[in-house]
A protein has these predicted regions:
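Alpha/propeptide regions of enzymes that mature by internal proteolysis
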Residues: 1-308
Length: 308
């Protein structure tokens, strides 16, 4: 489960309740559950002290889980998150290996809440530096339309301070590289604990491709798991056969590659799917301006980029 920093205990408690409600033998005939709950801090936009996540929210999240496309952007635990000073949240992506290498799939889900605007890179293009005027602000200080709609080529009003100057003052903007990111890594490749650790380490390369340098105090976690290696709840034999991929040749390198690419894309999807949000104390975090971003990508020679 993913949530914010001050709701970890509440979510974990609700996961235990949900499990006990659906398994009457748990805690009497068999052991209990150890919930896994990860968090990032959304205090800039959210009234985090209110601890608004409750038992019903957790039950609904578990009961509504299903296959198919995953909702992205400002949803679930990602509702109040900020990525590279744009609105962030939940992003997903996956890669499938060639059939000759097993046809395995690597899936990534990221809850993005990290990075500083000048760091953002998309396909090698310094998007963050080009769009640095789109700063998180307090609505009482700066008029929202000027934040959301102003383009680098838009003429400034007569006698008005440049937008970058007005938005870069400490009382108006977030100017530090702080935050966290949670990456969930799933694969149907049969992996040992060692291999899963190696895959998790490569997720950091995917974050780096978007511009992250893992700032001081940034809590970056990767939780990796492999789906085919399942054990029976109660063992009926002293041993059991277990397959796992070998750590040599093309397969392991293709898995590394898949992790890096999918992690990078998941971060970018969290940005492209999130929209401008007004949070507590009239704070505004702008969504990534997609049209301007696409124009910049084309300007830098990424001619294949187009709006759907």
């Amino acid at each position: 489960m993913l949530t914010n920093s001050l709701n970890v205990a509440r979510v974990a408690d609700a996961v235990i309740d949900w499990s006990l409600d659906r398994n009457k033998a748990m805690g009497t005939e068999t052991w209990g559950i150890s919930p896994v709950v990860a968090e990032t801090n959304d205090m800039y936009l959210n009234d985090i002290r209110g601890r608004h996540v409750n038992r019903e929210h957790v039950f609904l999240a578990i009961d509504s889980a299903k296959g198919g496309p995953v909702e992205e952007g400002a949803v679930g635990g990602g509702t109040g998150m900020i990525c590279y000073d744009f609105k962030g949240g939940i992003g997903t992506a996956s890669r499938k290996l060639p059939d000759k290498l097993g046809g395995y799939t690597v899936g990534i889900l990221a809850q993005t809440n990290f990075g500083w605007r000048p760091q953002l890179v998309i396909d090698g293009v310094p998007i963050g530096r080009e769009l640095e005027q789109y700063k998180p602000v307090r609505r009482k200080t700066v008029n929202p339309p000027s934040v959301i709609a102003t383009h680098p080529s838009t003429p400034q009003q007569k006698n008005a301070a440049p937008l970058r100057t007005r938005l870069a003052t400490p009382q108006n903007s977030r100017v530090t590289d702080s935050g966290s990111v949670i990456v969930g890594l799933a694969t149907d490749a049969p992996c040992s604990t060692r291999i899963l650790t190696r895959l998790a380490q490569r997720a950091q390369n995917g974050l780096a491709r978007t511009g992250s340098h893992t700032g001081n105090t940034s809590g970056d976690f990767v939780i990796s798991f492999s789906t085919p290696r399942r054990k029976k709840h109660f063992a009926d034999a002293l041993t059991y056969p277990a397959e796992q991929i070998i750590e040599q040749g093309d397969l392991i390198n293709y898995l590394f590659w898949a992790v890096v690419e999918a992690t990078e894309e998941a971060v970018l999807n969290s940005l492209f799917k999130a929209e401008t949000m007004i949070g507590r104390d009239d704070r505004i975090v702008p969504g990534l301006p997609i049209e301007e971003t696409v124009a910049l990508m084309n300007q830098y020679g990424r001619k294949q980029v187009h709006l759907p």
